[in-house]
Amino acid sequence: MTDSSISPSHPAGLSRALDNFLTRHRIGVWRVVVTFVLASLLFGHSRWDGTWVSPLLLTLGMLGVSLATVGRLWCALYISGRKNNTLVTSGPYSLCRHPLYVCNLLGILGLGAMTESLAVTAVLALAFALMYPAVIRTEDRFLASAFPEFAEYARRTPAFFPRLSLYRGESTWTVHVSSFQRNIADSVWFLGLSVVVESFDLFHDAGVLRAVVTLA
């Protein structure tokens, strides 16, 4: 049975339909999740505030956000101007097929840790786990149909979890400067969100905001 002949009622067809739905609506789902997080920060305060757990979570969060930002810039350096027309397999893309999403997970967990709430971090991690496997499968199907060499690339390169032994760099690399400049904003937004998260904490400490719930 070929891909084009799979019926929507077939299990594979249903799985693909669900993947496509989650891929199309992931931004809307994230908006709901972000609204929940902002409401939690507005009306809640961490139960770990004033304990040794608080600086630990903050440090881990800053580390995650920093790694995510640097990683996304590294990916943008390789992929800018080449997305959908060239199969990039070197640099970060030699470690795994979807390094941008690895960076997204690091940033999401980092932001969650910076809220100093394990519950908020768990919600963010769950949202990622529900949506991004579908996004990865959808993108893999597109790449397989667009690039004949993708099958060999997928055979040797893991989809998500990086394998450091596979790293292969380039001695020279042509950068599409205009595309890279456009992607810079997409690469550093985790830093902006980290400022927003910390602002809520400062407002609570200053008495500008009053917590009505305790965040675990």
Swiss-Prot record:
Entry superkingdom: Bacteria
Keyword Glycoprotein: no
Keywords assigned by UniProt, alphabetized: Cadmium resistance, Cell inner membrane, Cell membrane, Cobalt, Membrane, Plasmid, Transmembrane, Transmembrane helix, Transport, Zinc
Membrane topology summary: Multi-pass membrane protein
Recorded GO CC terms: plasma membrane
Transmembrane segments annotated in the record for this chain: 27-47, 50-70, 116-136
Subcellular location as annotated: Cell inner membrane
Name of the protein: Cobalt-zinc-cadmium resistance protein CzcN
Organism: Cupriavidus metallidurans (strain ATCC 43123 / DSM 2839 / NBRC 102507 / CH34) (Ralstonia metallidurans)
Taxonomic lineage of the native organism: Bacteria, Pseudomonadati, Pseudomonadota, Betaproteobacteria, Burkholderiales
